[in-house]
């Protein structure tokens, strides 16, 4: 287990890649967020540390490894529909998810410019019924098993962006 908010996270990922003998797919599923209408600064900064700095630390490490080894690779990340349509009750969460969307788009452009065979899949689910939102009253929560199947399908089909919420999938 790697704590992506720690400075050694990049080194730990590289060690894991070495132990496995390489990497074809980096799958990023890490994030935190709260409804924070009072703008509790600790919650806002923890969200930025995990969803912003931690995200960059890990995704950039995976990208650099794939680029440096000239391997065909695939970087798939669970972001959120909140990056597409901001949620006023969760400003840091929505903002960091938008950052993730753009960061992946930029790395995808860079890979094409450098003629690197690295694919990207930005997975944007809506509200998934998980422990992260347990006890809160989010509308139309998505079944976690169905979302998991949609994620696997998006990765296997090498989709660039996969919105998993019928309300936003236009």
Where does each model-flagged region fall?
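Short alpha-helical oligomerization interface
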Residues: 36-49
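Active-site loop immediately N-terminal to the catalytic Tyr-X3-Lys motif
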Residues: 85-91, 136
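Residue(s) in the substrate-gating loop at a strand-loop-helix junction
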Residues: 80
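Conserved NAD(P)H cofactor-binding loop of Rossmann-fold oxidoreductase domains
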Residues: 29-35
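C-terminal helical subdomain
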Residues: 122, 134-169
């Amino acid at each position: 287990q790697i704590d992506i908010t720690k400075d050694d996270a990049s080194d730990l990922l590289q060690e894991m890649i070495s132990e496995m003998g390489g990497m074809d797919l980096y799958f990023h599923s890490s994030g935190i967020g709260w409804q924070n209408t009072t703008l509790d600064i600790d919650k806002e900064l923890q969200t930025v540390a995990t969803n912003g700095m931690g995200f960059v630390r890990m995704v950039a490490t995976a990208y650099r490894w794939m680029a440096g080894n000239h391997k065909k690779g695939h970087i798939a990340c669970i972001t959120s529909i909140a990056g597409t349509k901001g949620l006023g009750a969760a400003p840091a969460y929505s903002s960091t998810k938008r950052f993730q969307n753009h960061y992946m788009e930029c790395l995808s452009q860079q890979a094409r410019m450098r003629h690197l065979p690295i694919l990207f899949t930005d997975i944007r689910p809506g509200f998934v019924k998980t422990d992260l939102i347990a006890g809160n009253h989010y509308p139309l929560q998505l079944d976690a098993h169905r979302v998991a199947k949609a994620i696997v399908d998006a990765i296997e089909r090498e989709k660039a962006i996969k919105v998993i919420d019928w309300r936003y999938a236009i």
